[in-house]
Amino acid sequence: MIKRFIIIVALLTTVASAAQEGTSSPYSFYGIGLTKFKGTVENQSMGGIRMFSDSIHLNLRNPGSYGRLKLTTFTVGGSHQSTALKTDNDSESSRTTSLDYLAIGLPTGRLNFGVGLIPFTAVGYRILENNDETSNRYTGRGGMNKVFLTAGYSVNDNLSLGVDVNYNFGNIQNNFTTLQRGVQLGSRQINRTDLRGFNLNFGLDYQRKLNDNLKLYTVATYAPQMDITTERMRNIATLSFRTDGSEVVIEENDISFPQGDLSLPSEITLGAGIGTNNKWFMGAEYSRISASDYNFNSGNSFAEVQYDNASQYRLGGFYIPEYNSLTSYFSRVVYRAGLRFEETGLNLSNEGINEFGISFGVGLPAGRSFTNANLGIEYGQRGTTNSGLIQENFFKLSISLSLNDKWFVQRKFD
């Protein structure tokens, strides 16, 4: 199984290398970029909810779920997204492909562990602004990733607690080039920010039987506000342009800024749901993010930008016709659906940037073990055309593999 896992990771990494920015959203222009979904395809296909956990799947959104893990589990996931962007006067389209997560969970008894890599934010935009006097071009790339170590402890059959220790790292580059009409030379400004530092996320997973058929699921997670280190540099250059549009640097100057801090906002999530083992589940969650405490300066300075506290509302679930059917493969398939609404906290020209998504997915049994492939689709909308802003309509196709095995087995010899 390990060899299969390595081959799969290599293939997905090769595919994802075609577009590692992970986004083409103009809204990634602001702050440290667009926040990436931090969860598995299984989570995403149910509106992003984090409360459901079992013994054979990793739940990257709730460290408390690791206490229920019974098998060593590898999971890897990637996605392809098509986006249509429009304003009141124009429209464009874009596509991105990315590797979304890579993780392993290791059960050792009541105390279980996990380790993995997942994107935190992504920057990827290209904006052209032309008028009678100037021609401006804004481009950006990069983002922040996190390596995480998770520990989850099963207190009893009902309660499990856990913590994520995340090391965040990455860099963001924002470029601005301007050329004035009738002037031979132009100017370019490159702002690069390197980011690194730790943050924590605590999770509680509580499940209890209500009767012989129904089970109650509840979840609570909390990530406290923590600071990470930033190092910023600026390159200012005078340019000339060849006939093919390429740049020639005439003169340039590097400016270094003092080391600073970025406050990652606190986040709290509460959720509850009900279901029947191996049959169906439905749940709802609410998250509150203190984005108004955000204090990052990337070199992009706009008076009409501010951050408000963010909220997320999620609803989702799954249905399995007959999980142990011997005659029908599709009766053993897990059918998932969900929806979400997010107030992102980003406020431009007094317009809050909101996001909506509706998702569907399937979990496909593969082989004799608990190994499964997961497919998910999401259609969503971000932003608005009000106040001269941009509305994005996106379609996302996600795929993941979850491979299970049993390690640390004491072998018996005759």
Region roles according to the model:
Residues 20-414:
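Subset of outer-membrane beta-barrel
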